[in-house]
Amino acid sequence: MEITWNDFEKVEMRVGTIIGVDDFPEARKPAYKLQIDFGPETGIRKSSAQITHRYKKEDLLQRQVVAVVNFPKKQIASFMSECLVLGAMGSDNDIVLLQPGAEVDNGLRIG
């Protein structure tokens, strides 16, 4: 499916730093609850991520990631997800987080 440049510009992807990671036992598939700091303009957002196979909780803290921050909130079990963390998904659904190649300021927009 082809999209227009105007469609792409509507997707607000920003860099944020993971500042909190908790287990999410209520999720249907193994997942973590993440708190991500997107800087002063966007603030701290929560997200659920099915990345327990590849990442330990302690390895995620202070890691920068890329997320879509302008999707509507989504209820996942008892948790309200406020952004979508992006990653590359392999054939076995193993997700590798998308992150900047060097540390950048939280909140920088991807474009």
Where are these regions (language model features)?
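Phosphate-backbone binding interfaces of nucleic-acid-interacting proteins
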Residues: M1-G111
